[in-house]
Amino acid sequence: IHLTEIKLSKDKEILVRGKSLMQGYWKDKKSTDKTIINGWLHTGDLGLFDDENYLKILGRKNEMIVNSGGENIAPAPLEDLFLSYDEIDQIMIYGHEKPYLVALVYPSEEIKENKKLVRKIFDEVNNNLSLTKKIRKFYLIKNPFSIESSELTPTLKIKRRIVEKNYHKELQSLYK
């Protein structure tokens, strides 16, 4: 972006500075001081630069999963792999401070009760993932995440903490 600098912090957060960026939050010094540090706007997004120096956004910093081995895993790119299948309508990957990743899945109407087909999709996707990014188990949910249940934002993003709370028992059962 012209006249804008972009770099990554040590934890891969995207930092931006330039004349076209906001100077701070209106009448909110506390939020401004948390967001703009030494002239750099901390976006809250995680990213990396590819071989051609293009910036790839990995997901939100506050959505990062840190497994029991201390590895940081961005769930959004993994979820996108599963959502590329028509048979998967919704998915949320979970595994914070856990030994492996699991998922809540809302399958499409066509395969709603076909756990074998969902398992086949998981096996297919997992074949191309590193060991720590493989989704070992999943739970088929009966109802989709929704705005009405407070599990989705108005822009249809998953409210992970609320879903984790609502499905706590189901998620924990995947670690037994």
Task: Name what the model sees in each region.
Residues 31-32:
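Short secondary-structure edge/capping micro-motifs at helix/strand boundaries
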Residues 1-3, 41:
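Short coil-to-beta-strand transition motifs
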Residues 8-10, 18, 23-24, 46-134, ...:
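AMP-binding/adenylate-forming catalytic core of the ANL superfamily
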Residues 14:
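Loop-rich non-cytosolic ectodomains and luminal regions
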Residues 167-176:
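Acidic/polar alpha-helix N-cap and adjacent early helical turns
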